[in-house]
Structure formats: structure tokens, C-alpha cells
């Protein structure tokens, strides 16, 4: 086992984060402007508001530079990843993006971790400050149930202004100004249990490096402060008070002296010198007269890298018994000289918003730093240090410099012990590996504590170096070890080594369960992935003389041999044997054997010989030195190989059954009579026709053939028992086909195969599972070859006779687990044809075995014995037989239903939308049993939606029931459903299949139940895409075809509350706001659909409300229906059906629904005719407005009594507009047939009748509306329709006066606007009174001026009939008659 680099996480959309941090790169990438919406659907739009702040782009001087910057942008960012891999920070200049962990299902069904942006924006609060460093520190939970686990992650960010700010999920917790210089580096140390008793226990701390100072914050104090701040932020957000003072913070501040520049640092922690080192150090500092203390003092050690010296070592003396001071002892500690403890000042508060507000405050007072001189260093005037990385055990440190060197330091001695060359701009990190005691191999003569599996675990450290110039990642064994791994990873990656784990643990909580934390990882922006480096412990032990290293070399050589393109067949096996025998370590030898067995390039004979050779070699060794695990591994693989060889030989034998097969034989075999067999054949034939699909088969995809490599992966030998590993359904089918496919086709001996598999150790239950998986998955081939039923019967009989298949002591009154296993497989299968056949075979074999057992028991009975034993046997037979009969009925029902759902109406009635083209899921008995009482009707409703069949077709297919119940669906003002002959022209076998389904499911597919489910399915699909208005129209059609008013009321109420009322209220408020029919853009924004779809939606709402009113009227006349279920489906469980929910609904409050119907009619009319200056809610008083959009079953305070005349006037004007618009629309349709075809909204609606009905409810005079309608008809020249409409007018005298004016307008147009000679002569002969009256008329009010004179004469005579003789205008009417008659003679 060698080093490996494994991807453990990926980015959801790293390119978007790059565009946010580097706006100048946004337009350079074509995909940046038009990103795939599927990739960005999970990102929060509000979090990316800062993207709009585009920066001016400067043209690139070179194309290569631009291309390189696209990939190397991560090198310019500040990057930090939490050790628990739950949060990542990417920052640049003033911007930062916080990425959170998400889990996503991959195509293989496994969960994969991804990073997605949870927050982004600007993190700078001071003008001109930039981000310089960042850390993600997970904080331990304080709850008992999650001790040792992370509770939340704090983000620490350092700035050029000197501020250090602490965040959580985009919210600023606190900000601290500890020094006025820029923050160079942030580093953290968390608690680790000491490995040895003599090792000093290190405290947690956060260290902040400035150009001339180091500030260390005690970890315990920081942990408590952060927890308090987080709690206070939550309280402030809840109460709205942001002026909560955060708790103080204790810290130390050291001023570093005698060094030119500092770039990076490492805080080693508290150390104690040995007595010799103590005296040596005291002599060097104070000379030979220096006083020596009895106990060595404790010191905090710091190492810096930079220049002059290249590496500096600092030691801060501490009191060995002096604890860290808290803020309570602040006054006492202010004058201490050893270290400066003070309460952190300068709190800026925090913000609950994503973007911080600018707060103008004075900078806090800076505490002076305690001077700390460098004790010694590594002087090198030309060398400048760039970074330092401390090892996990605090004994070694790696330093990089500007010469391209990586130098390994001994921290305790302060010397360089190793140097690597050629690593310019290197990034470094450490990996610490603990030895696994189970992998330790004892060697002879080794008596050390590490030589046995009971000794302590050893720890190895490896240095990881990433060289971006070369794009290589190397792993080195320390201190003087070789390179143990190298990987080509690209030139634009970032190596992340946090060097800490979870903050807030102690020696107790750290011993509890902890989540896995990574030690080092590589972020690759090109592949948008995060990779971890895995190093096995034994690589630390490898050297040139190591046996393990030799074994690894042989394993690599073996892998290369297996990968060879054209291995020599004559020597291939010999070379493999030689390599296997040369490997010494059992674990490595097992790994080598596994690689050989997993290779698909090694022949079966070679695998068998190599495994046998390894087995023989182990047996020839001394018993004490033989590894039992390896011996068992070889033995188990040999048994599997022998089984594979035996099955392959049986499958290749030329075996053909010569027994003829007839229909009579099949009937006898399945225990069916001729009628039942014919019915079964007919059902399977219809099923096969409707389920025929064009499939592609390749020659190499031969059934019954399984590579030995795959065979070994599927099976396992453990404790002398052969078991099948947990595999997928496809893998079970492949293994079962290898065992049984030839037998099912009669091409292999069934008896020999069963004997071979039983001898190998496979249990009958496993064999039955494999047999059924093959049979049920190969449905198409089985239905094409009925002879396979006989082979299945034989195979099942042989399996059932195995020893442990059916327990002989099983209680005769219980169900056999053997047959229950087979029934469960049939119940769960979605291939209903194969499942039905297998159930018939199982029923036949079970009955045959029960009969033979009964005969055997009967033959052993003595003559004087009681017949009780025979009775018990028949009870057992009856119990199991009933289960088989129930399953056969259920499978038959499921088969008929599946046949129906796969049938198609040809050609389709209308253009199918995308939801109608989606395939329906296949059915199984299990799905129907778990689907609830409405599962069957729901499945058929989904199919009806796919085919878009009309409700009339469902009624015709159920014509026999219609004869018994001749009630027709009620018709209202809604559009009548089309005739079947107009829509369904060629439906093929659909009506017959529907009729068969009705017969099979008389209760589940009762017509009202089916219409209810269809209604609900259509409205659900409409809700997904409101632009498909025809879905909602079709839903209302199904609703109106429901005969039972209780069901109809419940369904309509559920539809209204679930899908319609929100959109209806939004449309109401929108139209009331704009005062007219809204435009398309406004409709889409507020209601979620176009203006055209909105018009149809309002019409459907009106139909639904009218249907509810009609259903409420007839509720008391009809009883509540009783929902029955077929006997075979009484055990169904699952969700409550739609019809049951509908019957649970309360009755509606009739006046409230009528009130909503009035509003809906107003909205529908305004949208249909695009009326202007219409505010729907202005037509109602305050009571009417308050009652809208309330629960339709509740009792609301509605308008009553006399209405304000102002409201009545406004309502009358609206209704007159509707009538005028309706007549105008009808007139335009009569003149332009194309307009009639284009207009589909309200084309069959009698708008005048609707207006009159609205006038009745709105307290407007109905006769005014009728008279206006008559006048509009005559104005458009529709005199014949006008004569019919006159009959409905009550006040004929007022109508006659209005028509008299219209007649005058017609004559005025004919006389004054034609200007003919005859007309002028006629005008001169008219009476002066009539001339004056005609001149006062305005012919422009006429909508149609081309009316014949004869029609006008008829209108004048009609006016004379309507006017009484005493009327003031009667004489004027007489003069008009004379004038019209005179004009007729011209």
C-alpha cells in the first residue's frame, strides 16, 4: 500500500466565486455571462449583490498572462479551510466568500460533499484596509449529548489596518485592534493529549503576528468570549438591541527586537529546559557568575522567519506556577514586568446584516508591548525566509526561503538538520500517522515493545512539499528518510495545512468521540476539487534493506505486469507465480492476490493455478509461521474458483430437453382448466403488446456468461459457508443468469445445477432469491418462450426439496417462510407478466408438495385413528392456498392496470406538453398496497392526463353503469364539454382496456372516484405550469362530471383553498391597483402567469364557484357515498385518498361563495374585454371587501339592506360597459371569422345573461341592463336580435324613447351625410319640428351606419307599437314614419 491522493470534496460553482473576487476575469470567460441555470440554482441571489460593482477592466498585454491568471487566481487569495471540512474562506483585498458544506447524491447513489457559497460580500470596515490572513476555527460543543464534537465554526480575519475580526456565517461577532501595524499572520494551537508523561501540556492560543510584535490570546479566554458574543448577537437580533457590550478578552503582547524583518512565525508553546541546558543558557547570558535557580523556569518559545537573522528564536519567561490572569485581576496585573496582561479594548460591536455599516469611532488606546529580544538565530544575510510550518508534535519545523530551499529545523536545539533544493515558491505541511497495531507483523528475535501487537502505537511524521513551479506534490519521511510519494497535481493548486483541530477541548472531552479532521489537503481550482493525501505508516519504516519495501516493489512490479498491453502467454503465469512467492509479508501477499483476482486480463486457469500454488506454499510452511488469515483467504478463493469452473462446464454442455410441450401440459402443470388458461394467455398477450419496446442488444452481452473477476466480487466464503455480498439488483441478475439462465431455457441440466450449487454451500433461500431475480428481470424473453415455465417449475421443485428449504417441523397452521419469500418477490416486482407466471408456478409447486405430504400422512394413518391429522393438513393447505389465491388476484389486477397505463391513444387529441410526455412509473403490487385507497385511481388519473382523454370518453367506457344511473352532469354557465366524436377519433384498444379495468376494479375506479382523481391530477399539473390553461379547464370539466354533490363540494373546496385562492386574490389586488386589465409583465410578476392565461384562469375560477353553488343546493337530496374496496385490496395502507379528504370537508357557506362568484365574474369580464377604468374592489363596501378570500365554509358579515346610491351608480356603469363590450365583440366576430377563431375566452358565455344576473345581486336595475343591451344591438345593426331582446324588457315606454333617438340618428346620417339631391328635396318637405330634431341628432354614436332603410322603417313601426298614443313623442314618431316611407320610395 503506497501513498495516495484522494478527492474528498468538490466545489459547486468555483468559477462564480472567482468572478466575485476577480471582476476583471468575469468577461474573459464566456460561461461567466451565461452560466448554466442548473448550476446556479442553489446559490442565493441576495448574497451576490456585490457582483454588480464591476471594476473597469484593463486590457491584458499578453494573451498568455490572461490565460494563466484564469487558473492561478487562487494563489493571490487568502485561503483557509476548517479542520472539520465544514467551512472555507476565500478572501482577496476587501471581499470574502464563506463557503459551507453541502451533501449531494451522485449518479452512483452515494452522497458527495460539495462546497457552496453561503455568504459573500465586503468584510472591510475601515477605508483602504485589505484582508491579509484568515482562519476557520471550529469550537467544541458544550452539550452533554455532543461532547467533543464541533458546535459552530468561527472565522478569524486579519486586516492591514491591524484589526482582527471574528465572524460566524457572515455575521460579525467582534472586532479587536491590538496593534496599529498590519496583521501579517494568524495561527492557532488547540489542545492535544501529551503522548508521554514528560511532555509539557500545551494550552490553546491564537497568535497574531505584526511586523514588530506578537500578540497571543489565551484559548480558554477566547473560547468563552466567542461563545458569549455569539449568544449576545442572537439575543440582539431577537430584541433589536445592538448595544450589548461584549465580554473583555485577555491577551499578551510582545515587542520583538534585534531583527530586521519578520514574515512568518511559529508559536512553539511552553517548554522547560533540562538542568544542563539551563546552566548553559544562564552562562551564555550572564557569564560564569550567573545565578542558577533550583527549578528550571518555564518559557514560551517563538520562532520567526525573515531577514537578519534568517530565523530568530525568542524565549518569553513565564512563572512556572503563575496562571494566566483573567480580566478580573486587571488592576493588579497592569504593572507586572514579565508579561503584559490587559483586557482587550476597542470593541466595535457587531452587525446582524451581511454588509457592515460604517461606524465612526475613535481608535482605542494601544497598550505598549513588552520588549522581547532574540536569544539566537540562524544568521544568513542573503537569505530571506518566507514561511515556517511547525510539525504536529512541536519538535520539528520546516522553513521556506527565497532561494528555493526547504530547511528542516530542530526546534529544541535550534539547528538546521536537513535541506531540500529546487522548491521555489514552495508550500509545505505535515502529516502525522499513528501505527495500526493490527497491521504490525511480529518478527523472530524481536523482543522490543514495538515487536508485538500489544505494545504502544508508534507515530510517524511526513513532510509534504508542493512545488507550484513544477506542479508536483512530494511526501518525505523525516528526519532523514527518503521520498515516499510524488504526484503530478498541476501548477495552480493551494496546499492547506491548518496545524490545529477543535478549540475548547480538554484532557477529558478530547478523549471522547471526535469527528474526523483532515491534516492536510490540496485545493485544485482547475478541477474544482479538494484532495487529501493518505500516507500509510509503514512507509516510515521503509529503507533499502526493508523487507516491506521490497514487497511493495514486487507489488508495483506485479501491477505493471497486469497492466501490460500484450503479456506473453507462455511466461505470464510463471512470472506472476514468481512474484507472489517472493513476497514475504502476509498482508502484502494478500493485497497482491487480490489485485490478481480483480484483474480482467488474467485467465481462469492462471488464477486457479496461482491461488493453488500460494495455498500449497502456505501448507508446506511451519505451522507457527503460517498466517491464518491468508490461508483462509486462499482456501475460500479456491472454493469459489472450483464452483465457477463447475457451473461453466454445466453451461457449456450440449443439453437439450426432448420432451414436447403443449397447452394441455401447461394447464396441468399450473393446475388450471382450459378457460383459466385461455384468460391467462389473453391477458399476457395484451400486456406484451402494450409493453413492447425497441431495445438494442450487443453480441457480447450474452445471457448466462459472467467473467470470473465479477463472479469473485459477488460471492464470499466465510466460516465454511458461501454467501452473496450485498449487491445491486443488476448484479444479482447477472449472478443468477450465470447459474440459472441456461436451465430456464432447457439448455442445461437443472438437476445437476441444483446439486452443484447445494454442494458448494449456497442456501436454498439465496438460490431462490437469485432464481426469482433472473426470472422477473428477463420478462420479455420469458413471455416469448412459454416453455421456460416448465423449466421454472422443475427448478422450483428441486429447490423446495432441499434440506433447509421448508422446515418439516413448521407449524401447519402458519405460513411457510419459504413460500412467503417467493410471494414477497412477486409483490415487489414491477414486471407483472413474469411475476404472474412465477406466482402460478409457485402456487402449483406448493399445492403439489402439500398434496404429497397429505398423502404420505394419510397412508400412515391407522384405521381406528381419528381424522384430526388430516383436518390439520387441510387447514394448512387452505391457509397457504388462500395467500396464493390472493396474490394471483392482485397480480392479475396489477397486470391489467399496467397494460392500461402503457396503452396509447393514437393520434393524440392535442399537442402534448412536457409533463404529458414524461413516462409513467411501472406498477407493482407493493406500490398499490402502499398507495392507499386512492392509489389505483390515482395511477389511472395520471395516465388519463398523459393521454388527455376527455371526461366523455370515461363515461362512454363505463356505459353499463350509466344505464343504471342515467343522471347527467349538471350544466351551468361554463363551457359545455365537447362531444367524444369531435375529440377522440382513433383510440385503438383504449376503450376496451378501460372497460376491462372498470370490470376488474368496480369500486376503486367508480366513475365519481376516477373523475375526482383526474380533476386533482390536472389541477396539480396546472399549478406546476400555470401557462397551460387547458389543464385547469380540463380539471373543471372532470369536476362537473362528478355526480355526487358531496364529493363535488369537497373537491372544489380543496382545489380553491390549495391552488386557486392565492392567485385569485393576487389578481384582484393587481387589477384594483392598476384600474384596468393589467399587462402581461405585471401579470407574470404578481400572479405568476401571462395575461392570456390569467383570463382563462378567472373563467375557470368562475366555473368552479358556480359548480360549488350547484353542488351545495343538491347536497341534502343525495346521501354521502360509501367508499368500498375490492376484496383483493382490503389490506391497502398509505395516504388518505382524495375522495376521503373531499368527504371530510365542511359544507360551504352559500352566500359567501356567491359573493366570491360575483367578484370573479367582474374580474373575468374586465380581463376578457380589456376594460379600462375598472377597480373591482371599488364596487363593494367595507363589509364586502372584508369578506373576500376568507374560508368558504366560514360565516362572514356580508352586505345587506339598501346599498349606497353611489355604489349602485358605479356598478351600473360597469355592467353597461360589459354589455357594450360583449355586443362589440360579437359584432366583430360576425364580421371577421378569424377573430372568432382567435378568441377563446368566454366565447360560449352569454355575457348579457351574466350581466343581468350580476345586476340582480348588485342591486342594479335589471331592466336598465336589458334596455341598454337592446340599444347596443340596434346600434350595431343587429335588428333581428334586438327584436328578440325587446321581449325581455319590462319598461317598454322608456325603451321606445331610447329607440326613437337611435332611429333619428339613422335618419340624420342618411339625410345629412349622404347629401343627395333627392334627400335634400325630401328634407325640404319634412315638418320644421322634425328637421330641427333630426339636426340635433349625432349619427357618430351609431356603431353601424350601413343599416338598410327598410330595417329602419321596421324599427320605427316597432317604436310606434311600444309608445302609448298620449306620449309626448308619439307625434314625432308619426312624422318619422312618413319620412322613412318617403325615403323608401327614393
Swiss-Prot record:
One record GO biological process: positive regulation of endoplasmic reticulum tubular network organization
Annotated region described as Disordered, given as residue ranges: 31-69, 959-982
Modified residue annotations for Phosphoserine: 38, 448, 914, 976
GO CC terms of this entry: autophagosome; cytoplasm; endoplasmic reticulum; plasma membrane; presynaptic membrane; protein-containing complex
Localization in the cell: Cytoplasm; Endoplasmic reticulum
Feature: compositional bias, Acidic residues: 43-63
UniProt-recorded Gene Ontology molecular function terms: enzyme regulator activity; GTPase activator activity; small GTPase binding
Keyword Nucleotide-binding (UniProt): no
Main location per the UniProt record: cytoplasm
Basic and acidic residues composition bias: residue spans: 959-973
InterPro entries membership: Rab3GAP2, RAB3GAP2_C, RAB3GAP_N
Similarity-based family: Belongs to the Rab3-GAP regulatory subunit family.
Function noted in UniProt: Regulatory subunit of the Rab3 GTPase-activating (Rab3GAP) complex composed of RAB3GAP1 and RAB3GAP2, which has GTPase-activating protein (GAP) activity towards various Rab3 subfamily members (RAB3A, RAB3B, RAB3C and RAB3D), RAB5A and RAB43, and guanine nucleotide exchange factor (GEF) activity towards RAB18. As part of the Rab3GAP complex, acts as a GAP for Rab3 proteins by converting active RAB3-GTP to the inactive form RAB3-GDP. Rab3 proteins are involved in regulated exocytosis of neurotransmitters and hormones.
Protein name: Rab3 GTPase-activating protein non-catalytic subunit
Organism of derivation: Rattus norvegicus (Rat)
Amino acid at each position: 500500500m503506497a501513498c495516495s491522493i484522494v478527492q474528498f470534496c468538490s466545489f459547486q460553482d468555483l468559477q462564480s466565486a472567482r468572478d466575485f473576487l476577480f471582476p476583471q476575469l468575469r468577461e474573459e470567460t464566456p460561461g461567466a455571462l451565461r452560466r448554466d441555470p442548473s448550476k446556479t440554482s442553489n446559490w442565493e441571489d441576495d448574497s451576490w449583490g456585490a457582483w454588480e460593482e464591476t471594476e473597469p477592466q484593463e486590457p491584458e498585454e499578453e494573451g498568455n498572462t490572461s490565460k494563466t491568471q484564469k487558473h492561478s487566481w487562487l494563489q493571490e487569495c487568502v485561503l483557509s479551510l476548517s479542520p472539520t471540512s465544514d467551512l472555507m474562506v476565500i478572501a482577496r483585498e476587501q471581499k470574502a466568500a464563506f463557503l459551507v458544506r453541502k451533501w449531494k447524491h451522485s449518479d452512483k447513489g452515494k452522497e458527495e460533499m460539495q462546497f457552496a457559497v453561503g455568504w459573500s460580500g465586503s468584510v472591510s470596515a475601515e477605508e483602504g484596509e485589505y484582508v491579509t490572513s484568515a482562519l476557520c476555527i471550529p469550537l467544541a460543543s458544550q452539550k452533554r449529548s455532543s461532547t467533543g464534537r464541533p458546535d459552530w465554526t468561527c472565522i478569524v480575519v486579519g486586516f492591514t489596518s491591524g484589526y482582527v475580526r471574528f465572524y460566524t456565517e457572515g455575521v460579525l461577532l467582534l472586532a479587536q485592534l491590538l496593534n496599529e501595524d498590519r496583521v501579517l499572520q494568524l495561527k492557532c494551537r488547540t489542545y492535544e493529549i501529551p503522548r508521554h508523561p514528560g511532555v509539557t501540556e500545551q494550552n490553546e492560543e491564537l497568535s497574531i503576528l505584526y511586523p514588530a510584535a506578537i500578540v497571543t490570546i489565551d484559548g480558554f479566554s477566547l473560547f468563552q468570549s466567542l461563545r458569549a458574543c455569539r449568544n449576545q448577537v442572537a439575543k440582539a437580533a431577537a430584541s433589536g438591541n445592538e448595544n450589548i457590550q461584549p465580554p473583555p478578552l485577555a491577551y499578551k503582547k510582545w515587542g520583538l527586537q534585534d531583527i530586521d524583518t519578520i514574515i512568518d512565525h511559529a508559536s512553539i508553546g511552553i517548554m522547560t529546559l533540562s538542568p544542563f541546558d539551563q546552566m548553559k543558557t544562564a552562562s551564555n547570558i550572564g557569564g560564569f557568575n550567573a545565578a542558577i535557580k533550583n527549578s528550571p523556569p518555564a518559557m514560551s518559545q517563538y520562532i520567526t522567519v525573515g531577514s537578519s537573522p534568517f530565523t530568530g528564536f525568542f524565549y518569553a519567561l513565564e512563572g512556572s506556577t503563575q496562571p494566566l490572569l483573567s480580566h478580573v485581576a486587571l488592576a493588579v496585573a497592569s504593572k507586572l514586568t514579565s508579561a503584559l496582561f490587559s483586557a482587550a479594548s476597542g470593541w466595535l460591536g457587531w452587525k446582524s446584516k451581511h454588509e457592515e455599516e460604517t461606524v465612526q469611532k475613535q481608535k482605542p488606546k494601544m497598550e505598549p508591548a513588552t520588549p522581547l529580544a532574540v536569544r539566537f538565530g540562524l544568521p544568513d544575510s542573503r537569505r530571506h525566509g518566507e514561511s515556517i510550518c511547525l510539525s504536529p508534535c512541536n519538535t520539528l519545523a520546516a522553513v521556506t526561503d527565497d532561494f528555493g530551499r526547504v530547511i528542516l529545523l530542530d526546534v529544541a536545539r535550534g539547528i538546521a538538520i536537513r535541506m531540500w533544493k529546487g522548491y521555489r515558491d514552495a508550500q509545505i505541511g505535515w502529516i502525522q500517522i499513528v501505527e495500526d497495531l493490527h497491521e504490525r507483523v511480529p518478527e523472530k528475535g524481536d523482543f522490543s515493545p514495538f515487536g508485538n501487537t500489544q505494545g504502544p502505537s508508534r507515530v510517524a511524521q511526513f513532510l509534504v512539499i508542493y512545488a507550484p513551479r513544477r506542479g508536483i506534490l512530494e511526501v518525505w519521511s523525516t528526519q532523514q528518510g527518503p521520498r515516499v510519494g510524488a504526484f503530478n497535481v498541476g501548477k495552480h493548486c493551494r496546499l492547506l495545512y491548518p496545524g490545529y483541530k477543535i478549540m475548547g477541548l480538554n484532557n477529558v472531552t478530547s478523549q471522547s468521540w471526535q469527528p474526523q479532521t483532515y491534516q492536510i489537503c490540496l485545493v485544485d481550482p482547475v478541477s474544482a476539487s479538494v484532495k487529501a493525501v493518505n500516507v500509510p505508516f509503514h512507509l516510515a519504516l521503509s529503507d533499502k534493506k526493508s523487507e516491506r519495501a521490497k514487497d511493495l516493489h514486487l507489488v508495483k512490479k506485479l501491477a505493471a505486469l497486469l497492466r501490460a498491453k500484450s503479456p506473453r502467454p507462455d511466461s505470464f503465469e510463471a512470472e506472476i507465480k514468481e512474484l507472489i512467492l517472493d513476497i514475504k509479508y502476509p498482508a502484502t501477499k494478500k493485497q497482491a492476490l487480490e489485485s490478481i483476482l480483480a484483474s480482467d486480463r488474467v485467465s481462469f486457469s492462471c488464477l486457479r493455478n496461482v491461488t493453488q500454488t500460494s495455498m500449497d506454499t502456505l501448507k508446506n510452511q511451519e505451522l507457527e509461521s503460517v498466517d491464518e488469515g491468508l490461508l483462509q483467504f486462499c482456501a475460500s478463493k479456491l472454493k469459489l474458483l472450483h464452483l465457477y469452473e463447475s457451473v461453466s462446464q454445466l453451461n457449456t454442455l450440449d443439453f437439450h430437453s426432448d420432451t414436447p410441450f403443449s397447452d394441455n401440459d401447461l394447464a396441468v402443470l399450473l393446475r388450471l382448466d382450459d378457460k383459466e388458461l385461455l384468460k391467462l394467455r389473453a391477458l399476457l398477450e395484451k400486456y406484451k403488446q402494450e409493453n413492447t419496446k425497441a431495445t438494442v442488444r450487443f453480441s457480447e452481452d450474452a445471457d448466462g456468461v459472467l467473467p470470473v473477476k465479477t463472479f469473485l466480487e459477488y460471492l464470499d466464503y466465510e466460516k465454511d459457508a458461501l454467501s452473496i455480498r450485498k449487491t445491486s439488483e443488476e448484479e444479482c441478475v447477472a449472478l443468477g443468469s450465470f447459474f440459472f439462465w441456461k436451465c430456464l431455457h432447457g439448455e442445461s441440466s437443472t438437476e445437476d445445477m441444483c446439486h452443484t450449487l447445494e454442494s458448494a454451500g449456497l442456501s436454498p433461500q439465496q438460490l431462490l432469491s437469485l432464481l426469482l431475480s433472473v426470472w422477473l428481470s428477463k420478462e420479455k424473453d420469458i413471455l416469448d418462450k412459454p416453455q421456460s415455465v416448465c423449466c421454472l417449475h422443475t427448478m422450483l421443485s428441486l429447490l423446495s426439496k432441499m434440506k433447509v428449504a421448508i422446515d418439516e417441523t413448521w407449524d401447519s397452521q402458519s405460513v411457510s417462510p419459504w413460500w412467503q419469500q417467493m410471494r414477497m418477490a412477486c409483490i415487489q416486482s414491477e414486471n407483472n407478466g413474469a411475476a404472474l407466471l412465477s406466482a402460478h408456478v409457485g402456487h402449483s409447486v406448493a399445492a403439489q408438495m402439500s398434496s404429497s405430504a397429505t398423502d404420505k400422512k394419510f397412508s400412515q394413518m391407522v384405521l381406528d385413528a381419528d381424522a384430526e391429522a388430516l383436518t390439520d393438513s387441510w387447514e394448512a393447505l387452505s391457509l397457504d392456498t388462500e395467500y396464493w389465491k390472493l396474490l394471483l388476484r392482485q397480480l392479475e389486477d396489477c397486470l391489467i392496470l399496467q397494460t392500461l397505463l402503457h396503452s396509447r391513444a393514437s393520434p393524440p387529441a392535442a399537442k402534448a406538453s412536457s409533463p404529458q410526455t414524461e413516462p409513467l412509473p411501472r406498477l407493482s403490487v407493493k406500490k398499490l398496497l402502499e398507495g392507499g385507497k386512492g392509489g389505483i385511481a390515482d395511477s389511472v388519473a395520471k395516465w388519463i392526463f398523459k393521454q388527455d382523454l376527455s371526461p366523455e370518453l370515461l363515461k362512454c367506457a363505463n356505459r353499463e353503469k350509466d344505464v343504471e344511473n342515467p343522471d347527467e352532469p349538471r350544466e351551468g354557465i361554463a363551457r359545455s364539454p365537447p362531444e367524444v366524436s369531435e375529440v377522440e377519433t382513433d383510440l385503438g384498444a383504449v376503450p376496451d382496456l378501460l372497460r376491462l379495468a372498470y370490470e376488474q376494479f368496480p369500486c376503486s375506479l367508480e366513475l365519481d372516484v376516477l373523475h375526482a382523481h383526474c380533476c386533482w391530477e390536472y389541477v396539480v399539473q396546472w399549478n406546476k405550469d400555470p401557462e397551460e390553461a387547458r389543464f385547469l379547464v380540463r380539471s373543471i370539466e372532470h369536476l362537473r362530471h362528478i355526480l355526487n354533490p358531496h364529493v363535488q363540494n369537497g373537491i372544489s373546496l380543496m382545489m380553491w383553498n390549495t391552488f386557486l385562492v392565492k392567485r385569485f386574490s393576487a389578481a384582484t389586488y393587481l387589477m384594483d391597483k392598476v384600474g384596468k386589465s393589467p399587462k402581461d409583465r405585471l401579470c407574470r410578476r404578481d400572479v405568476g402567469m401571462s395575461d392570456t392565461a390569467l383570463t382563462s384562469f378567472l373563467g375557470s375560477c368562475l366555473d368552479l364557484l358556480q359548480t360549488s353553488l350547484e353542488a351545495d343546493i343538491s347536497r341534502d337530496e343525495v346521501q354521502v357515498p360509501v367508499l368500498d374496496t375490492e376484496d383483493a385490496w382490503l389490506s391497502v395502507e398509505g395516504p388518505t385518498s382524495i375522495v376521503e379528504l373531499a368527504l371530510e370537508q365542511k359544507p360551504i357557506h352559500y352566500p359567501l361563495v356567491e359573493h366570491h362568484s360575483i367578484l370573479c365574474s367582474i374580474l373575468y369580464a374586465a380581463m376578457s374585454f380589456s376594460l379600462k377604468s375598472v377597480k373591482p374592489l371599488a364596487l363593494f363596501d367595507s363589509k364586502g371587501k372584508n369578506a373576500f378570500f376568507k374560508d368558504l365554509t366560514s360565516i362572514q358579515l356580508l352586505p345587506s339592506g339598501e346599498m349606497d346610491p353611489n355604489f349602485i351608480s358605479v356598478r351600473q356603469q360597469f355592467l353597461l360597459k360589459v354589455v357594450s363590450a360583449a355586443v362589440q365583440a360579437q359584432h366583430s366576430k360576425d364580421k371577421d371569422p378569424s377573430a372568432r377563431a382567435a378568441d377563446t375566452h368566454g366565447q360560449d358565455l352569454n355575457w348579457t345573461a351574466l350581466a343581468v344576473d350580476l345586476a340582480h345581486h348588485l342591486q342594479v336595475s335589471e331592466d336598465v341592463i336589458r334596455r341598454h343591451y337592446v340599444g347596443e344591438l340596434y346600434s350595431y345593426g343587429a335588428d333581428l336580435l334586438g327584436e328578440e331582446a325587446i321581449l325581455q324588457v319590462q319598461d317598454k315606454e322608456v325603451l321606445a324613447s331610447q329607440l326613437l333617438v337611435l332611429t333619428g340618428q339613422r335618419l340624420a346620417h342618411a339625410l345629412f351625410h349622404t347629401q343627395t339631391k333627392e334627400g335634400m328635396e325630401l328634407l325640404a318637405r319634412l315638418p320644421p319640428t322634425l328637421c330641427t330634431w333630426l339636426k340635433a341628432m349625432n349619427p357618430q354614436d351609431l356603431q353601424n351606419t350601413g343599416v338598410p332603410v327598410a330595417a329602419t322603417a321596421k324599427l320605427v313601426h316597432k317604436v310606434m307599437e311600444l309608445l302609448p298614443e298620449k306620449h309626448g313623442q308619439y307625434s314625432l314618431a308619426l312624422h318619422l314614419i312618413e319620412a322613412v316611407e318617403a325615403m323608401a320610395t327614393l
